[in-house]
Amino acid sequence: MATADVRQELFGHADQTNFLNCSKGIKSWMFTLDHKRIGIMYLIGVTFALFLAGFFALWLRTHLWYHGTAIEGEMAAGSDAFFRVTDIAYNKLFTLHGAIMVFSFIIPSVPAALGNIVLPMMLGAKDVAFPRLNLASFYLWIFGTGFLMFALVNGSLDTGWTFYTPYSIQSSTGVIYATFGAFILGFSSIFTGINFLVTINTMRAKGQTWFRMPLFLWSLYATSIIQILATPVLGITLLLLICERVMHIGIFDPVYGGDPVLFQHFFWFYSHPAVYIMILPGMGVISELIAIYSQKKIFGYSFIAFSSVAIALLGFLVWGHHMFTSGQSPLVNVVFSAITFTVAIPSAVKVFNWLATMYKGSIVFTTPMCYAMAFIFLFGIGGLTGLFLAALSTDIHFHDTYFVVAHFHYVMVGGTLTALLGGVFHWWPNFRSSTQRYDGPHRMLVRLRRFQHHIFPSVRDGCSRHAASLRFVRS
């Protein structure tokens, strides 16, 4: 008997054809409609965006060492002079880091990469509902990210990733290219949301009711609702910004009777729900990992499922907490603050149910499980720091400080990136017919320690500026 036949007899999968080797050549990948291949291409693309934005983050940090000692764009004398950036260069690196990390990495990372790969298989479907639309969304992601990159070489971008007016109207940098890139990325996000929503609604296997779906699919469903309803608001806002720069239509520019605060309302009406586009899919991944590696049925399945939908719906009602210092009426601020605290309830439901699932479970400390536990730890810190920003009395002091930077990074990077890595370590061996690395938990602990060393000092730095005003004086 031939060697291949022996392997087939013993293992049953030797030399079998899979989605990676079924066809060869770059064209087979460029024009593929296979959801798994599209997910792999998304994973490669967002990884590139992660490393590029991460490089900008490291580079802008050197500004704290060599404050304003080098001429922008030139090499000064000395081996380390290249890393010395001016204040202007700092603004550009800060903006590019935020824009690429948010629009090109965090938003599409878990839903578009992991979601594309596992969603049809979890449903028992052959593919997503609209395979061609799925491929189109990936190419829109490439074009949108390309426009952001083009802004890098065409005057760069120094407005901050939020594109706040009126400065974004007046800046001589590549604002139009960057906003158009974000506009295209919005279409990519909408197409993904439509595809997933229709797929989950219409292509579930026979007998798979709503409350038999994996919790990861519930999180993708809630995320898709946000993508479809909120992203068009951002797209229209960015188009208005471009028209304001080109035609001076007087929407956001106060010189022509516009209102810059209106831009903030439009932007955050999308961007706060977008926070849940970033974190909800990661929560779904963690729900799967906790149940599998605790070797228990998930505790409170229905509560976790409905909490995803509740977070998605409440996320549309809290955008104003980003604008407590913008001149809103005190009554509006109180309302937004109260609703913001309400959002913490379904988030806490998820965390406590994860802990209850782990309680008395036969926990297997594999790499994915370690990432899931790290997620709970980091997301817990991010959630606790968020309470200070939801309260009016403390947000006034913490606004625009490193405290906000720490909160955002604990939730987005400590949450989304950790969940993405946990999901990749969990599902990738199944696709490659390989085993998990035994040194994975050690590597995770190294990453966790480095992340803490990098981000936690920002909490202290954000508090120090107003420490005197926060002290309790004993009478």
Residue ranges and their predicted role:
Residues 2-475:
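Membrane-embedded and interfacial regions of multi-pass energy-transducing membrane proteins
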